[in-house]
A protein has these predicted regions:
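Short beta-strand elements
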Residues: 46, 51-61
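C-terminal binding/interaction regions
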Residues: 2-36, 41-42, 66, 92-96, ...
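Basic, gly/Ser/Thr/Pro-rich low-complexity segments located predominantly at protein N termini
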Residues: 38, 55, 77-79, 96
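Short, thiol/selenol-centered motifs that function as redox-active sites or metal-ligating centers
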Residues: 49, 72-80
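Short amphipathic alpha-helical face segments that pack within enzyme cores
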Residues: 77-85, 122-126
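A short interface-forming secondary-structure element
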Residues: 59, 68-75
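A cross-family signal for key residues in well-ordered alpha-helices
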Residues: 24, 56, 86
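Flexible, glycine-rich terminal cap/loop adjacent to redox cofactors
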Residues: 74, 87-94
Length: 155
């Protein structure tokens, strides 16, 4: 993709959308990449615009996020939001993250967004919430489950 800029300003969009805070996180993202051995990982995409985000977390035995990384592709808003989210959630407990709300995520971006751009901004938040939900579900033990006997026909 040589010759293509990493970021293209749409002349039809207000400069307010491309606030320095967003541009800084888009051009120099925090923890963009992969963890060697994440505790949990989840991916999602926005089918309308094609944004994709994978979030990888390293969670301590005390249920605290010690490292958060992301990777993906998409618009400046979705990728900057993922960077901001990773920076924000490190050091937070899973309980604190369960209480983290979408409005708080939007406030971290420091720009006003249209409804369609909010979907881009909240993609990584959605990935985080889905991951937290899956962590709350009890795991099914693989080796302790006895197979269910096949039904027999009564004679």
């Amino acid at each position: 993709m040589a010759g293509f800029p990493l970021f293209h300003r749409n002349p039809d969009v207000s400069d307010e959308l491309y606030d320095d805070h967003i541009l800084d996180h888009f051009e120099s993202p925090y923890h963009k990449g992969h963890l060697d051995c994440p505790t949990c990982s989840h991916s999602d995409r926005n089918p309308i615009c094609g944004d994709q985000v994978t979030l990888e977390l390293l969670v301590s035995d005390h249920h605290v996020v010690t490292e958060a990384y992301f990777h993906g592709k998409g618009c400046a808003i979705s990728q900057a939001a993922a960077s901001i989210l990773c920076e924000t959630i490190e050091g937070k407990s899973l309980a604190e993250l369960r209480d983290f709300q979408a409005q708080q995520m939007l406030e971290l971006l420091k720009v006003r967004l249209t409804a369609s751009r909010q979907k881009c901004a909240l993609l990584s938040f959605k990935v985080l919430k889905t991951m937290l939900y899956s962590l709350d579900q009890p795991a099914l033990p693989c080796s302790d489950v006895e197979p269910t006997p096949a039904p027999t026909l009564a004679e």
